[in-house]
Amino acid sequence: MVEHFQKRGIPIHGLGMQMHIGVSADNAGIAGGMRQLAATGLPVHISELDILVSDWKKDVDLVYSDELQQKQSDKYQFIAQVYKQSVPPHQRYGITVWGVSDAVTWINPNFGLRDWPLPFDKNYHKKKAYDGFLEGLRR
């Protein structure tokens, strides 16, 4: 699509990835998508990042277990790490997390889910997801 628009003289100044994903989202697909965007030479922005432990499934009994917390942390780390590995520094526009705290997530009220998709809990305390994200940025 980018090439098609550019050939028609339509200016494109950058590309964004909305990433409202679950903990089971395919890592190979995510990495491949980032490489494809980077191959355009345009700035790449992860414009909306939140990672659902429910994987978009309605489960009123879902518990934010240690296992789910770790999976979420691992996915946040992977996203930050693959962004840095796949997108050259001059093309990195940034990563925007779509909210700060689980207290204000748009996911639960809009989709009727029980989830904890953000790096801070409802009391604005850091979660494992925060640590994973930070570790991914450091690598």
Model region roles, listed by residue range:
Residues 19-20:
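His-enriched metal-coordination microenvironments in redox/metal-binding proteins
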Residues 23:
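Acidic, metal-coordinating catalytic cores used for nucleic-acid/nucleotide bond scission
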Residues 29-45, 49-139:
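Aromatic-rich peripheral "rim/lid" segments of glycoside hydrolase catalytic domains that contact
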Residues 15:
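Active-site-adjacent helix-turn-beta-strand microarchitecture at beta-sheet edges
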Residues 1-8, 26-34:
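Distinct, well-ordered alpha-helical segments
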Residues 7-11, 87-90:
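Short helix-capping segments at alpha-helix termini
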